[in-house]
Regions:
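An alpha-helical repeat/solenoid feature that recognizes helix-turn-helix modules
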Residues: 1-2, 26-53, 70-96, 100, ...
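Ser/Thr/Asn(+Pro)-rich, low-complexity disordered segments
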Residues: 2-3, 313
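Helix-turn-helix repeat elements of alpha-solenoid scaffolds
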Residues: 3-13, 53-59, 98-99
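Alpha-helical scaffold repeats of the Armadillo/HEAT/TPR superfamily
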Residues: 59-62, 98, 103, 149-153, ...
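Asp-box/WD-like beta-propeller blade repeats and closely related beta-sheet repeat scaffolds
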Residues: 60-74
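C-terminal low-complexity, Ser/Thr- and acidic/Pro-rich disordered "stalk" regions positioned immediately N-terminal
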Residues: 251, 255-293
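C-terminal membrane-anchoring or membrane-association module
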Residues: 302-323
Length: 323
């Protein structure tokens, strides 16, 4: 596993050097329309200890300084920007219109009337609801308005859960399809909120939990399928593993998936400290450059590693099903 992570880190470093040539020197943007390219690269570089404020002399945070640019991409823009800024507790770029509060307000402003979030329209989608909740999770105890929005979304997700414990999405045709990615996004969000997606009664349907549902997509000796009758899928595998990593980190009392402040200071440099177990998170009911997927995978799996996730989360659950 260490050899694999070393290779991935080396490849990510090489890719980061190539990305330098794609940065607009005037704006710090990696893409003229997609702010998420900056956000995701910030996450990836933070995970491997690279200084995001000096990528070939350019500050990737600056690419997120214009709120209108961040919002231009739709709901994904503010969500990923907030995740990126919080990943290393980065200061908000100066001289711009983006602030953490502005990002939070924008996310809250597009909550659907039924309680979740959507790519477009006013009908909650499990994927976008999961992503929004993951970004807002750190503010649950700090902001009553955020708490109210999250509580409403948690209730909506429980209602949206499929009869087997999984989640479905629609591709705009009105038909819902159960996918591993939808289930993975919900698992990631619940883990960030301190909700056990394997035992919380709100997320168990007919004896099946969110974790149970996700593991049904697993292919022995391989990865995860996108849909139940499909084959191993790259995106399905990526999202399932990082969701399980998020769940592992929740069970272990570590920071949530995108919060790297336990090992990385606000400057993006790795510090030699042992991660500490944070106080338990209050469950909601109680209180033109496309970044390769494997770069983001470094960010995701660096905190635990595939072997750890499989050994602690996946194997016991699969064995339990055989008993």
């Amino acid at each position: 596993r260490k050899s694999l992570i070393f290779i991935l880190k080396s490849e990510a470093s090489t890719s980061a050097l190539r990305v330098q040539q794609s940065i607009d020197p005037d704006t710090g943007r990696l893409h003229k329309a997609k702010s998420t390219d900056n956000s995701r690269m910030i996450l990836a570089l933070t995970a491997i200890g690279k200084d995001v404020t000096n990528v070939g002399g350019h500050n990737l945070l600056a690419g997120l300084s214009d709120l209108e640019f961040v919002k231009y991409q739709g709901n994904n823009g503010p969500i990923w920007a907030l995740l990126a800024l919080d990943s290393g507790n980065y200061p908000v770029p100066s001289g711009g219109t983006t602030t953490r509060q502005a990002l939070i307000d924008e996310i809250l402003s597009v909550q659907t009337s039924d309680g979740g979030w959507a790519i477009s329209g006013d009908r909650a989608d499990s994927d976008m609801t999961g992503m929004a909740l993951t970004a807002l999770a750190p503010y649950y105890k700090k902001d009553p308005t955020v708490k109210q929005a999250i509580d409403k979304a948690i209730a909506r997700l429980s209602e949206m859960q499929d009869d087997d414990g999984g989640f479905s999405t629609t591709y705009g045709d009105g038909k819902y399809i159960a996918t591993s990615e939808s289930t993975a996004q919900v698992l990631t969000a619940l883990s960030a909120l301190g909700i056990d997606a394997d035992t919380d009664s709100r997320f168990i349907k007919n004896g099946g939990s969110v974790v149970d549902a996700l593991l049904r997509y697993y292919v022995n000796g391989g990865g995860f399928k996108h849909v139940m009758d499909g084959e191993i899928d790259g995106m399905g595998t990526e999202q399932a593993y990082y969701a399980l990593t998020a769940y592992y980190r929740f069970l272990s009392g570590k920071t949530n998936l995108y919060d790297m402040t336990d090992i990385i200071d606000m400057g993006g440099d790795v510090v030699t400290v042992e991660p500490t177990v944070p106080a338990a998170t209050e469950p909601a009911q109680a209180a033109q450059t496309n970044i390769p997927w494997w770069i983001i995978a470094v960010c995701i799996f660096g905190g635990a590693g595939w072997g750890v996730v499989i050994g602690i989360v996946l194997v016991p659950k699969l064995n339990k099903k055989k008993d």
